[in-house]
C-alpha cells in the first residue's frame, strides 16, 4: 500500500547550500522531518548546480519519512545568469538593464521545458521572453 502524504513543502534553496537554519529548518521541523538528513541529500543532489536557486517540493509521509523532487531554477535566475546581471530593473517599462538574444532565450526555454506548462518550444520561449521583459531586459531578434 502507498504511504499516506501528510504534507507538501515547497521551498527555493541555493544549490548545495541547504542548512538547518531558516527557511529550511522551521519548514521541515513542523512536519517532523529529519532536517540534517534532508540537507545532506539535497546538497549532494544539487552540488553540480552551485550558484543557482533550486525549487524543491518535499512530500512528507505519515511515518515522517519524506521524498523530494528538484525542479529547474526559476526563469529569472537563468536569465540573470545568461546575461551576467545582479538584478532586474526596478522600473522595467522605463529603465532597461540589458539585452538578451533569441538564442539564449531558446537555451533557457529548452532547459525549463520539463517544468513549464507549454505545448511547444515556441510557447516556452514566449514565456521566458515575457519574464525577461518584466525584468527590464530587452529581447533581441
Swiss-Prot record:
CDD domains with a match to the protein in the record: Ribosomal_L11
SMART domains in the cross-refs: RL11
Reported modifications of this chain: One or more lysine residues are methylated.
GO molecular function: large ribosomal subunit rRNA binding; structural constituent of ribosome
Any GO BP: translation
Assembly with partners or alone: Part of the ribosomal stalk of the 50S ribosomal subunit. Interacts with L10 and the large rRNA to form the base of the stalk. L10 forms an elongated spine to which L12 dimers bind in a sequential fashion forming a multimeric L10(L12)X complex.
Function recorded in the entry: Forms part of the ribosomal stalk which helps the ribosome interact with GTP-bound translation factors.
Protein name: Large ribosomal subunit protein uL11
Recorded name of the encoding gene: rplK
Keywords associated with the record: Methylation, Ribonucleoprotein, Ribosomal protein, RNA-binding, rRNA-binding
GO cellular component: cytosolic large ribosomal subunit
Protein's organism: Alkaliphilus oremlandii (strain OhILAs)
Family from the record: Belongs to the universal ribosomal protein uL11 family.
